[in-house]
């Protein structure tokens, strides 16, 4: 199975890539590097001993996504790409909505066109506001909403 990890050069994404490769999956990474460094890719390759196809691209770039899905024959997606700073999401709400919502919709549309039906979407603990209990589970009631948490609900 060939899995595309969006945001795969970020902290959580790169660790997920390592785990997937060590579990025997073929992994392709897409990241625009706005919150990550390309230096992560050789480090992942050193840990796993496997080459990682890397694309510096944005999830808003439909043409780039089409090319990646066509070239790499993607079977599933793990979606970590997105802007994530709560404070900045208040200062730049449009940028966050465009990137996190429109970008995700673009990704899902390209998946649909290529017959890819499996996606794991990484949400955010911000949807719980001040949690009613810890550790947080999916049953925890949703809390006060910020721009960032609204995007992830």
Feature-to-residue mapping (PLM):
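N-terminal Rossmann-like NAD(P)+-binding domain of SDR-like oxidoreductases, especially those catalyzing
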Residues: 1-151
């Amino acid at each position: 199975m060939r899995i595309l990890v969006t945001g795969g050069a970020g902290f959580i994404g790169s660790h997920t890539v390592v785990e997937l490769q060590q579990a025997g999956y073929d992994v392709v990474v897409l990241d625009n590097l706005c919150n990550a460094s390309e230096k992560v890719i050789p480090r992942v390759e050193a840990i796993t001993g496997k080459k990682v196809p890397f694309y510096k691209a944005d999830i808003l770039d439909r043409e780039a996504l089409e090319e990646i899905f066509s070239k790499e024959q993607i079977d599933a997606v793990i979606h970590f790409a997105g802007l994530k700073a709560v404070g900045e999401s208040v200062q730049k709400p449009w940028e966050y909505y465009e990137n996190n919502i429109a970008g995700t919709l673009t990704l899902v549309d390209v998946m649909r066109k290529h017959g890819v039906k499996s996606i794991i979407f990484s949400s955010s603990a911000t949807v719980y506001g001040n949690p009613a209990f810890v550790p947080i589970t999916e049953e925890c009631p949703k809390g006060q909403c910020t721009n960032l948490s609204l995007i992830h609900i």
